[in-house]
């Protein structure tokens, strides 16, 4: 479960390494985000010479605000067949306003639940889907 102030790893090659969740999207009462949910993040650690630009055309730097989708959580997720899956870290992928990933590669496994949430592009970039 991801909530405000949670630190996450970035699982793509967008040049951003660590982010902090500042808002969970999906209604005013939504407190926690799970796999497949969109969040607003603040960049905490980015490669300064990387060419990623935000929507206004400026280079991304620390404190920049981005949209992201959660791809891994340490809190287990219950599947419809009764099984559970959990990961070793909390990770997200940076997306644009249309929901497309900004990076061209995804590092590490991602959960199958992303397919149900209409993130097929992230699924296709991932090396392993669990």
UniProtKB/Swiss-Prot annotation:
Entry GO CC: cytosolic large ribosomal subunit
Keyword set, alphabetical order: Ribonucleoprotein, Ribosomal protein, RNA-binding, rRNA-binding
Origin superkingdom: Bacteria
Amino-acid biosynthesis listed as a keyword: no
Function comment: Binds to 23S rRNA. Forms part of two intersubunit bridges in the 70S ribosome.
Subunit organization: Part of the 50S ribosomal subunit. Forms a cluster with proteins L3 and L19. In the 70S ribosome, L14 and L19 interact and together make contacts with the 16S rRNA in bridges B5 and B8.
Protein name: Large ribosomal subunit protein uL14
């Amino acid at each position: 479960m991801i909530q405000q102030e949670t630190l996450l790893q970035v699982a793509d090659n967008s040049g951003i390494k660590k982010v902090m969740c500042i808002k969970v999207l999906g209604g005013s009462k939504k407190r926690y985000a799970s796999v497949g949910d969109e969040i607003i993040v603040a960049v905490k650690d980015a490669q300064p010479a990387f060419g990623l630009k935000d929507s206004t055309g400026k280079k991304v730097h620390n404190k920049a605000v981005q949209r992201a989708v959660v791809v891994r959580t340490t809190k287990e997720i219950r599947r419809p067949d009764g099984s559970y899956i959990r990961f070793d870290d909390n990770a997200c992928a940076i997306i644009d306003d249309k929901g497309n990933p900004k990076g061209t590669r995804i590092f590490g496994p991602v959960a199958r639940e992303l397919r149900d949430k209409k993130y097929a592009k992230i699924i296709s970039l991932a090396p392993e889907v669990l």
